[in-house]
Design a protein with these regions (language model features):
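A C-terminal functional module that forms or caps the active site or interfaces directly
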Residues: 165, 171-188, 202
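Glycine-rich beta-strand-to-loop/alpha-helix junction loops that act as flexible
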Residues: 6, 57, 81, 172-178, ...
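Conserved, mostly hydrophobic/aromatic
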Residues: 17, 78, 137, 155, ...
């Protein structure tokens, strides 16, 4: 089980996440109400526990920009959004070897034709699995106007059926519209390796609500106890 609290903009929220039992925290370097700079994260990082995985969220395809940010901010993981670029993953793996936990986000479109959404999802899933370099796949909800971070859920039951028919050895992380009231259902339905939440534990964009965050982590932990890892759910933790 792996719980990531994303969209952090200050030192207090990731500290709270760590004390509540989160495994990782995320910092958004893409245009967003929660966007931060490498300098901000570099100042926050020394205030966090050594065993708390720090993940940077990127939408750029600029390798030099990502690599520079990783070093300056002191990150342990790289999360890529905005479509597949397998050559970028190759470059990042070559640059950082296995010192960085690489997460590739793929989307489940929640508007438009359901069959087309499923086929696009399968195409991306297959491409990443065949490529074999990413450590994890993050499944997020997508709309015609936003490729992720929508705060909307996708069809968990349908996604579970698709994943059952296309087993993958890669870690599966789910995101999109999660909050304390629905994270148990999401975990029990999809049986992922991890969950990722941002707006679902906030009092306002970029500011976490302590009670909501703690409730989310507690609900997620209890839900993970209800499921058993299947062959698609390796149990190794990402490097820190």
């Amino acid at each position: 089980m792996w719980i990531k609290i994303c969209g952090n903009t200050n030192a207090q929220d990731p500290q709270l996440a760590a004390s509540a039992g989160a495994d990782a925290v995320g910092f958004v370097f893409a245009p967003s109400p929660r966007q931060v700079t490498p300098e901000q994260v570099a100042a926050i990082a020394p205030q966090l526990p050594d065993d708390l995985t720090r993940v940077g969220v990127f939408q750029t395809r600029d390798f030099d920009e990502i690599a520079s940010t990783v070093r300056m901010a002191g990150l342990h993981g790289i999360q890529l959004h905005g479509g597949l670029d397998l050559s970028l993953i190759d470059k990042l793996r070559a640059e950082f070897s296995w010192r960085q936990f690489l997460i590739q986000a793929i989307s489940w479109q929640v508007d438009g034709d359901p069959m087309e959404s499923e086929q696009r999802f399968l195409n991306d899933l297959g491409a990443v699995v065949r490529h074999g370099v990413a450590d994890a796949l993050l499944i997020d909800a997508k709309t015609t106007t936003a490729s992720g971070g929508t705060g909307r859920t996708f069809d968990w039951k349908h996604a579970r059926e698709v994943l059952d028919s296309h087993p993958t050895p890669v870690h599966i992380i789910i995101a999109g519209g999660l909050h304390p009231g629905n994270v148990r259902e999401a975990i029990v339905t999809l049986r992922p390796w991890g969950v990722d939440v941002s707006s679902g534990v906030e009092s306002q964009p970029g500011k976490k609500a302590p009670e909501i965050l703690e409730d989310f982590i507690r609900a997620a932990r209890f839900a993970f106890l209800e499921i058993e890892p299947g062959p698609m759910l390796p149990v190794e933790a990402p490097p820190v």
